[in-house]
Each structure stands twice: as structure tokens, then as C-alpha cells.
Amino acid sequence: MKHRLNYLLVGCVLVLAVACFLSVSRPLTFERQRAEREKVVMERLHIIGQAQETYCRQHGHYAESLDTLVRNGLLADSLQFVPYSDHERFSLRTTVEITPSGRSLPQMECGAHYRQYLHGLDEAAIGSLTEKAEQTGDYPGVKVGGF
């Protein structure tokens, strides 16, 4: 009876040790995967930003859609989709601001939300990141440009 109780206690200790290890390793794994994915997404956003700059120099304003960049041969078709997402496109917003001196100032913002490029990872961690960004007034993901 005494040996059986000792085995049971050892089993409980092992289960608690594994649970403790997982509680520490899960957030670390998420952060590592997030950093890897953000690097890939930022590289793609940089390419889109360069294509937009080229389009703006040619036309005087930014392209209103990624399809326009693809049709003009400035962007490969596959680059308009967010990596790791379920074939979702980057969000794109453009505008032309008129300065007080009357000069036109084209602006654009292209980005991907956390839920897009962190698809398939810990949903609670993604929700926490999104909530934190929204509370601080930041973009809930990564982007280039802005208004």
C-alpha cells in the first residue's frame, strides 16, 4: 500500500512537472514563431511598398488595389497574399491629402492583421495581442505606410 502511494505521488509530480514545462515553453514557442512569420510578412510588405512607390512615380498617386500593381507588372500575383494565412490578401488603403499650400500628397497603408499571418497558432495569444494593440491605438498586426 505504501509503495502504491509513493508511485502515485511520483506520477503526480511528473504530471505537474510536464504541465509547468508546457506553461513556460508555449509562450516562448509562440513568440519565436511570431517573430519568424513577421519577418516573412515584413519582407513581402517591403516589396509591395517598393511596387507602390514605382507606381506612384509613374502615375502621381498610389495604386488603389494590389490587382492594379499585378496588372501593371510591378508585383507578382503571389505576393498580394499574406503568408501563412488562408489565402487572404493584404489590406490596402490609399488617399491623396491636400496640404495647406494646395499640394497633393499621396499616401498609402498596406498591412496584415495578426489573425491573418498568425493563423494556426495559439488563438488566446493572438486575441491578447490584438486586444493590446487596439487598446493602445496601434495597428493590430504589421504594416507599411500610414495616414
Outline where the language-model segments fall:
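Amphipathic alpha-helical segments typified by the pilin-like N-terminal helix
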Residues: 18-40
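Hydrophobic membrane-insertion alpha-helices, especially the h-region
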Residues: 6-24
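Low-complexity, acidic interaction segments enriched in glycine
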Residues: 53-147
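N-terminal alpha-helical signal peptides/signal-anchor transmembrane segments
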Residues: 38-59
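Short, Lys/Arg-rich N-terminal segment immediately upstream of the first membrane anchor
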Residues: 1-5
